[in-house]
Amino acid sequence: MWRIWRCRLSFLFATGCLLGALTAGLGSQMSDSVGRNVQAPAGVADASQEAGDVVEERTERTEEQAFALGPPRRHSSESLFPRNASVTARRRRNRRIALIATAVGVAVILAAVYVLRRRRAQRPQDPEPPAPRSVEDPEVLPEEDEASSSLPPPPPPSPPPPPPVEDPLSPESQTVDLSCLSGTTVRFFGPSHHFGGFTPLYDPAPDKRVATVDAGANALFIGGGGLNGQFAKTLLEEAEKHGIRLTPEELSQHSQRIQQSLLRRAVKSPGKLVELDTGVASPVFARSFGFVPVVPGLMWEESEVGPNVGVTFVHILKPEVTPYGNLNNNVMMYTVAPSGAAPDKTYSLAYKTTIAGVIGAAAAYNDTPAGQQYPVQGLRLPLLGGGIFRRNRSLESIGRANAEGTSLAITRYGPNFELQYMYDPSNAALHGLQEAESTYLASMLD
């Protein structure tokens, strides 16, 4: 910094000196030029000798007048050159300008010398390095790398978009604790604002991990109509959102192939959960499990109740097809209910086996390492067999079979889940459980 100031002051000093010299020379040159520009009268400038004689004659006259008596005789330069008033005024003005310019040059030089001396007297000293801060100083923080300090901080991650919200459930839904189910909490949904009051398969923001049960087909595929078709629609919509190319036919064939493979494994170990790692080969299932409480067709004729009745599958959905992207919605269950055309005793046995398969499969999954870490806490299910499988069977009889099968399954596998029944205009499940609760309480009084 001092070097820069010294260079600036040296340049100012030199400029002042040059300006003073130029202004002084300019004044002298202007005076001379004025003298040269004055023209002598005609006859005088042509003969320098005659001009000299005139001067000598004037000198002699002056001496004579000095010693002569009487008043002195006035004379002027008019005897040599006639006086010009404009030339005289111009000469005086130029002399003033020359004097002023000279004074300005001298002032600039003096100012430069004064500033130079003042700067030299106040020359700053190099600052001393700051003393190192104590380690005990609470404000001492670790220094950041130069590379990281030069870069701007990364922008905060944008918040995730809010999940789409479905129509709220009806306030008519109710929750009860039933003693006949060992205190299991049962929730009955009222009609929603969907067409026909249909209960959504999954909630946008569930407070627990709920597995929704699909009332599947005897051929073990996902698709078609009813609740099975609704599951296919949900999976296909989620896949499309994430750029997964999947057609209804491909989903139907893929799910059928996986579930048939699981069934072949499950019938070899009744009452045990079997697993099939589908993460690589499946576009929708990360892991899949199969469970049968008894071998299908062993205790009844499949020609009466239908094939594959009582088998249950548990599918862990991949994040790309999980409804609303919420991990509490990544469990799907699949079962096959008996045909309502079967005889009453056969139907009752097959129906109880189906309910036992659903609750038993969920309980067995919770016993696995993955289930222990992240267990299923609720089952959302329809009135199984109350759709196209009902045939001529009354809904009341289906409701009673559901209550009996649920009570037996909870007694066997434990009250580990909240049961959530989808909306049913007939309230057959509710009435069947209320009847079972009354019978149970009456038996406790005896």
UniProtKB/Swiss-Prot annotation:
Segments traversing the membrane: 97-117
Keywords (A to Z) from UniProt: Membrane, Phosphoprotein, Signal, Tachyzoite, Transmembrane, Transmembrane helix
Record topology, Cytoplasmic segments: 118-446
Biased composition (Basic and acidic residues): 55-64
Post-translational modification: Phosphorylated.
GO cellular component, one term: cytoplasmic vesicle membrane
Biased composition regions of type Acidic residues, renumbered to the chain: 137-147
Membrane topology designation: Single-pass type I membrane protein
Compositionally skewed regions (Pro residues) per UniProt: 151-166
Effect listed in the UniProt record for changing residue 158 to A: No effect on host membrane association (HMA)
Full protein name: Mitochondrial association factor 1 form b1
Organism: Toxoplasma gondii
Segments of this protein annotated with the region Disordered: 43-87, 120-176
Notes concerning its domains: The proline-rich region is not required for host mitochondrial association (HMA).
Localization: Parasitophorous vacuole membrane; Cytoplasmic granule membrane
Major localization listed first in the record, in broad terms: membrane
Ranges per topology, Vacuolar: 21-96
Assembly with partners or alone: Associates with the host mitochondrial intermembrane space bridging (MIB) complex. Interacts with host import receptor TOMM70; the interaction impairs TOMM70 import activity and enables the parasite to associate with the host mitochondria and then with SAMM50; the interaction is likely to be indirect. Interacts with host MIB complex component SAMM50; the interaction requires prior binding to host import receptor TOMM70 and is likely to be indirect.
